[in-house]
Amino acid sequence: MIFDDTTPIRFQDALPDHVDVVVIGAGVIGIATAWYLRRSGVSVLVCDKGRVAGEQSSRNWGWIRQQGRDDAELPIVIDSINSWESLAGELDEDIGFTRQGVLFAAQNDEQMAEYESWLKLAGEYQLDTRMLSAAEVDERLHTTPGQWRGALFTPSDGRAEPFKAVPAMARSLRKQGGLIREGCAVRSVETRAGRISGVVTEGGRVNCQSVVLAGGAWSSLFLANLNVNLPQLTVRATVARTAPAPDIFAGNAILDEVAIRRRQDSGYTIASSGSNEHFVGADSFRHFLKYTPALASSWRYLRLRFDGGLLDRLTPQRHWSDDATTPFEHTRVLNPEPSIKALAAMRKGLAHRAPQLADLPFVEAWAGMIDVTPDVVPVMDEVMGYPGLYLATGFSGHGFGIGPGAGRVMADLVLGRPPAHDLTRFRFGRFSDGSPMRLGPGL
């Protein structure tokens, strides 16, 4: 189940004259940030042009994984998975959270060596990650035996149902006194004496001391209107879910060309690991040089489409006045069509790797746009030149699992608390200060 612009509006709090913090974007990062801010006694308003979890936050795979993470992300996601576990008991709603493990199957010695190289990092954080032999994979993964050389496995990794989890957090935020308004685009920010003093929404002005921009695929466009350059592109990812299915694995697994996650409804969420698509547009050329290393490393897994950038087609404007209708109001929810080729690739992958699932109907298929930075790790930082404006974006397909941890990080930044983690890797300035590009593990 996903949310789109036909989903009934569920959160329609009146706009206040003043709050301490306005959060732009009601995805998992924005809602989690607001949740932790409110826990600290801060008054907070979350505005979203569309719906809570309307874009990637209801469309992702539902994985909550430590395994395979970037070294700088890992301590944050360790905090995050523990937060997901505590939230599951605290929210008074079933969000489908469970720890059933993440498994990356390897079909040859080269993949085994790649996975083994990550064990050192796992050991530094006392994770329960280990390598499985071929026989151990067959014991856990009830597919065709004998097709795997081994696997990397982290039993403590988990999953949750995205379409349940983020709205549940939003409802909890409201119970604590936080405000949420769907269908309310923030057009711009206001400044006074050199720092943030408020926001202009389509419904009026709201005064505040700080703003957190957690706009996902839209963050770069919002900043462009402020003459701030954020190198961020989008990738279309297609996902499907099956009818109830035999239990071939209780957790999440990458089986070479296909990924599976057991769902709470006894089906599987399915994705193809090689069918992400980037629609080449003006921003692609604008940021081409910064993305060259990522393109070189991911050419096997990323398809380029030359029929025009999707966001470019939807949002030809890059600048607007505060009293003008913005691109955010023209496109309430970014709701791309799923790729027919990607769905076919999933079918082929299942037939090859998990034939027990191959003939099951896909009861729903959807797509989402993933916000990707040049080094495939997020930005979590204050925006240079705009004191009081904070940015949390570019989670590059990793946002759902790390959501609560990233929300806590952003709340600490806004409140001026010493960060619990080293955030150097996530500086906004790394794209402009000559820092060497170091790629993260990928989408």
Language model: regions and residue ranges:
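Helical element adjacent to the flavin cofactor pocket in flavoenzyme catalytic cores
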Residues: 152-209
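Dinucleotide-binding Rossmann-like beta1-alpha1 core, especially the glycine-rich loop
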Residues: 62-140, 257-260, 267, 274-280, ...
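Short beta-strand to alpha-helix junction loop
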Residues: 75-78, 104-114, 153-171, 181, ...
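Glycine-rich FAD pyrophosphate-binding loop
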Residues: 39-58
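N-terminal Rossmann-like FAD-binding beta1-loop-alpha1 element of flavoenzymes
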Residues: 21-45
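C-terminal catalytic lobe of FAD-dependent flavoproteins
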Residues: 315-436
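Flavin-dependent oxidoreductases
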Residues: 32, 189-316, 329-340, 345-353, ...
